[in-house]
Amino acid sequence: MGEAARHPDGDFSDVGNLHAQDVHQALEQHMLVDGYDLVLDLDASSGVWLVDAVTQKRYLDLFSFFASAPLGINPPSIVEDPAFMRELAVAAVNKPSNPDLYSVPYARFVKTFARVLGDPRLPRLFFVDGGALAVENALKAALDWKAQKLGLAEPDTDRLQVLHLERSFHGRSGYTMSLTNTEPSKTARFPKFGWPRISSPALQHPPAEHTGANQEAERRALEAAREAFAAADGMIACFIAEPIQGEGGDNHLSAEFLQAMQRLCHENDALFVLDEVQSGCGITGTAWAYQQLGLQPDLVAFGKKTQVCGVMGGGRIDEVPENVFAVSSRISSTWGGNLADMVRATRLLETIERTQVFDTVVQRGKYFRDGLEDLAARHPSVVTNARGRGLMCAVDLPDTRTRNEVLRLMYTEHQVIALPCGGRSLRFRPALTIAEHEIDQALQALASSVTAVAESV
């Protein structure tokens, strides 16, 4: 029976009897519904395969809820453990204010996070819902630190600045609106600070074939950074960057550039802050991308795969004894993250640790990257700049239209879900558990779609 026949008046008051076919119509009455046309079957989907509850089609998921499902959907270590499912249900009944009322599941999560993902040099932790708020609180920590360092009081604190990169996406909340600069539609008409912004020296791949261009881009960016520090007259509180700019185009920043920026921060008494919301929790082959780049950040914002977002702090933050991690309610929120998310995250992190998933990511990431490079070699006029660190992989297409058409064909003809980024890039965000034969299917879908687009020109 069709939607109109069952609900001719658009009345969905019998929500207990809502069917998969009704989902889009029910949502459209109250919301902008511009996502995928499938309806996620939460029971039938598994691993890297999403099932459409309407058509029963299976989709290879290289999206993973915007890189937030580390072990895919319905991981066996969760759904096949009845005792754990009961534990998760108990945690979901109530939503306690974790910063004020403590519990065993909360403490277990914190200890597990510190053991599996923690950095001994960044012992301070803060948890909150949402990646933007993770970055927001990292910025607050840096701004407070700098204000105390300089002995500033209001209104002089308004002079403090945050140095950041072009093509950054740090979120869509208060302070982060002044940093995000990918698509104008995400920040237009919202008041923003005029904080200093320098070019992003994204590596062209393979780096060995673009040494001169890459070095020149980094030289210009570093010169602009020096000029920004000089112009700010000591008022830059921090520099923040994504080690790999996700939404901005999967732009990889070199270890040499980021190390140079870290030195500039030290020379100018500013904190060095990394946004690892998308690149953290193992997708690059280590807990954090910065661990492969020879960096020692003072603050790291995290989220997505960690289920609970937040900030790791340490380094020079403790040069100010009354920093935000040490003063009651200086940074806080009602729930300080969600307890049910923490219980789920604990099991996910235990599974990651037990199965040594990060080692697998290194191997599968190389396999994926080799396949993308081979595809680029076979279609040099269409596929370029194949790149990746671990499973955080991407390619460029000639223009936005071509990229969008390739994505459309992958989805409609091959049931493969991937993501756009930047002006003409196509990115892959699979679960850390994706198998080689599933990578093969992804590569075949991409190759077939690229061929179809090339032949239609």
From Swiss-Prot:
InterPro entries reported in the protein's UniProt record: Aminotrans_3, Aminotrans_3_PPA_site, L-lysine_6-transaminase, PyrdxlP-dep_Trfase, PyrdxlP-dep_Trfase_major, PyrdxlP-dep_Trfase_small
Q: Gene3D superfamilies, per this entry?
A: Aspartate Aminotransferase, domain 1 (3.90.1150.10), Type I PLP-dependent aspartate aminotransferase-like (Major domain) (3.40.640.10)
Cofactor(s) needed by this chain = pyridoxal 5'-phosphate
Give the pathway.
Answer: Antibiotic biosynthesis; cephamycin C biosynthesis
* NCBIfam families, alphabetized: LAT_fam (TIGR03251)
The annotated subunit structure for this chain is: Monomer.
Name of the protein in its database record: L-lysine-epsilon aminotransferase
Organism expressing this protein natively: Streptomyces clavuligerus
